């Protein structure tokens, strides 16, 4: 029988944003970034209360359909505990539907909050599994759970009945590497952006991406001078250019100037990885074009503070 947690127990979760793919690593590479959502979760005597401040305020649901709430419930079930009621307060800094892992961060925050309330019975691998299940792929969620950069993959059981297993290992990123995000003022639908991808690619393009993905793992760890080459891609970004023309224009413009720029996740955010600051004139041009400029560091793992 599940243990009922005491009323008044509270946790505060701080979860980082993430950038997925990093160019060639489609649904594989992820990077945690120093832009954070904070979620406070308290056990109450009955019902459900949800508040949202910041990004998504007035747009996100305030009931059990909120992704954080769904993830909390999944985490509580996995930990074999239950609660009479919940109060959930979300302070969001991660832009919604911009390719910065906002939905993965919500899932991670919920599972991590439940884990903290239950006394941390779930290890990192289980938190990655539960939070990735909401996404269907682990690159963003694993980065937010584990911090730094991750190489992630999905194992499909041969019996066809067991749920997919989402796995990840971390890459310790060279401390010289920083990130600059150029965030457009419009949303991108992950599903819509995925629909433009072909069902098949050439062996030549597959080989190209395998090599660049390998280069990227080395670039992140020890050789940041290889970031430009390591962010080259032929599997997804060329096909998405027509549906994200502003993003494609800026990625090409930056890469032509030697910057390791790529489409972050499903977009529309443009991400630049660098060891030297991006030219201020370029950033001013981006601002004048309506892009929000965010200077970011590589982030550590999600953190959970038990308040009571």
Curated annotation (Swiss-Prot):
GO MF annotation, one: ATP binding
Its EC number(s): 2.7.1.39
Domain of life: Bacteria
UniProt cross-references to PANTHER family, sorted A to Z: HOMOSERINE KINASE, HOMOSERINE/4-DIPHOSPHOCYTIDYL-2-C-METHYL-D-ERYTHRITOL KINASE
InterPro entries in the record: GHMP_kinase_C_dom, GHMP_kinase_C_sf, GHMP_kinase_N_dom, GHMP_knse_ATP-bd_CS, Homoserine_kinase, Ribosomal_Su5_D2-typ_SF, Ribsml_uS5_D2-typ_fold_subgr
Pathway: Amino-acid biosynthesis; L-threonine biosynthesis; L-threonine from L-aspartate: step 4/5
Keyword Cytoplasm in record: yes
Stretches assigned to coiled coil: none
Positions contributing to ATP binding: 95-105
Swiss-Prot/TrEMBL keywords: Amino-acid biosynthesis, ATP-binding, Cytoplasm, Kinase, Nucleotide-binding, Threonine biosynthesis, Transferase
Broadest EC class assigned to this enzyme: transferase
Family indicated by similarity: Belongs to the GHMP kinase family. Homoserine kinase subfamily.
Localization in the cell: Cytoplasm
Keyword set includes Nucleotide-binding: yes
Function of the molecule: Catalyzes the ATP-dependent phosphorylation of L-homoserine to L-homoserine phosphate.
Gene Ontology biological-process entries: threonine biosynthetic process
Reaction catalysis annotation: L-homoserine + ATP = O-phospho-L-homoserine + ADP + H(+)
Recorded GO CC terms: cytoplasm
Protein name: Homoserine kinase
Cystine pairings recorded for this chain: none
